Amino acid sequence: MQSCRTVAVIPARHASTRFPGKPLAIIAGRTMIEHVWRRCQEAQAFDEVWVATDDDRIRAAVEGFGGKAVMTSPACATGTDRVAEVALGRPDIDIWVNVQGDEPLVDPATLQRLAGLFQDASVRMGTLVRPLEADEAASPHVVKAVLALNGDALYFSRSLVPHVREPGTPVQRWGHIGLYGYRREVLLSLAKLAPTPLEDAEKLEQLRALEHGIPIRCAKVTSHTVAVDLPGDVEKVEALMRARGG
């Protein structure tokens, strides 16, 4: 049997409202997009790593450090739409992994875990979860995942789920990490679907898949990614890099 080809795609746009030009922000001497690209390469889980963008400045930067950039439409509303546009023209690629372009500390081992989910032929879509501490689980900014015994997601919510009716009942809550893998046909199908009621209510794009009956397998990891949302986050990430020695 021929093995599946797996590609990581890093969506990157220049026109961020809160942080214009974010992919090109310099962090410890390199652009943020290069940090993410390098960590994808370190994972050794992908046949290729591409950056999907609609901006020539990002394309030039990616090609400057030896990466491959694929130009996509400015009309793409989400990173998933951008990855799907790339996948539309590449029927030879089986597995597509959407890697957030604003997480320069993404752990290569977590990317390996995500790509590895698709060794199971029954997995159509995958993502990652991490164990939550009680103090962070209550925050609506931390998305919780409720899992079935086989690791499939039952639901994702900003609310504190599951609810513990009797105090003292032990429960492990899981936090969602926003990295996704798809089989090509699932990715293309999702990109064509309109937003769903629960997706609109929670503002969580992954609920579109669950509402349409597409199972999402979750790999459990321990590392926690750090996103760069604002210019002030750059210094925080640089401090973490220094603390970790890289």
UniProtKB/Swiss-Prot annotation:
GO terms for molecular function: 3-deoxy-manno-octulosonate cytidylyltransferase activity. Activates KDO (a required 8-carbon sugar) for incorporation into bacterial lipopolysaccharide in Gram-negative bacteria. It comes from the Bacteria. The lineage of its organism: Bacteria, Pseudomonadati, Myxococcota, Myxococcia, Myxococcales. GO terms for biological process: CMP-keto-3-deoxy-D-manno-octulosonic acid biosynthetic process; lipopolysaccharide biosynthetic process. It comes from Myxococcus xanthus (strain DK1622). Its main location: cytoplasm. InterPro entries: Cytidylyl_trans (IPR003329), KdsB (IPR004528), Nucleotide-diphossugar_trans (IPR029044). NCBIfam families: kdsB, PRK05450.1-3, PRK05450.1-5, PRK13368.1. SUPFAM superfamilies: Nucleotide-diphospho-sugar transferases. It is found in: Cytoplasm. HAMAP family: KdsB. Disulfide bonds: none annotated. The keyword Isomerase does not apply. Keywords: Cytoplasm, Lipopolysaccharide biosynthesis, Nucleotidyltransferase, Transferase. Belongs to the KdsB family. Pathway: Nucleotide-sugar biosynthesis; CMP-3-deoxy-D-manno-octulosonate biosynthesis; CMP-3-deoxy-D-manno-octulosonate from 3-deoxy-D-manno-octulosonate and CTP: step 1/1; Bacterial outer membrane biogenesis; lipopolysaccharide biosynthesis. One of its GO terms (cellular component) is cytosol. Its EC number is 2.7.7.38. It is an enzyme of class 2 (transferase). It catalyses: 3-deoxy-alpha-D-manno-oct-2-ulosonate + CTP = CMP-3-deoxy-beta-D-manno-octulosonate + diphosphate. This is 3-deoxy-manno-octulosonate cytidylyltransferase.
